[in-house]
Amino acid sequence: MRAIALPVKSLDEAKGRLARVLSPLERAALTLAMLEDVLDATLLLPGWETWVVSPDESVLEVAAGRGATPMPEEQPPLAQAIRQAEEEALSRGMDALAVLLPDTPLVTAAALTRAVHTLGPVVLAPAADETGTNL
């Protein structure tokens, strides 16, 4: 079995760089909408579980409601959430773990399928403008 982990900040902290243009409620709504878009893609991958790691109960409720496995984040920040998912994957004997930030735009099941079937111990997907990575 394999898993895709989606680490999500607390809705109170999410999309902080947009604080000057969006209210806290708008940032929370944007975060949840983007999470749902990514869940639409990840939940279509056969043989892959989707885990949502977050300290935010609302995020975990959305994840569970959509069919993903909610994982209460034990300790922020992002690197610790990823480490938590790695440890969980190891304890469950998973064959593979992918980490995908849930605010990655325009994710499709087809693109994820190509990425997760790429051979190699580590796969990075560069952003279209090559200023970062998305997977």
Question: Model regions: which residues?
Answer:
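Active-site acidic Asp-centered loop
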Residues: L100-P102
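A short, N-terminal amphipathic alpha-helix
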Residues: A29-G47
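Conserved donor-nucleotide/metal-binding helix-loop-beta segment in metal-dependent transferases, i.e.
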Residues: T104-G132
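Acidic donor-binding segment of Leloir-type glycosyltransferases
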Residues: P46-P70
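Short phosphate-binding loop-to-helix
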Residues: V62-A98
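N-terminal nucleotide-binding beta1-loop-alpha1 segment
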Residues: M1-L18
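Hydrophobic targeting segments
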Residues: A3-L6, L35, T50-W51
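Short, high-confidence coil segments that cap the C-terminus of an alpha-helix
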Residues: G47, M94, L119-P121
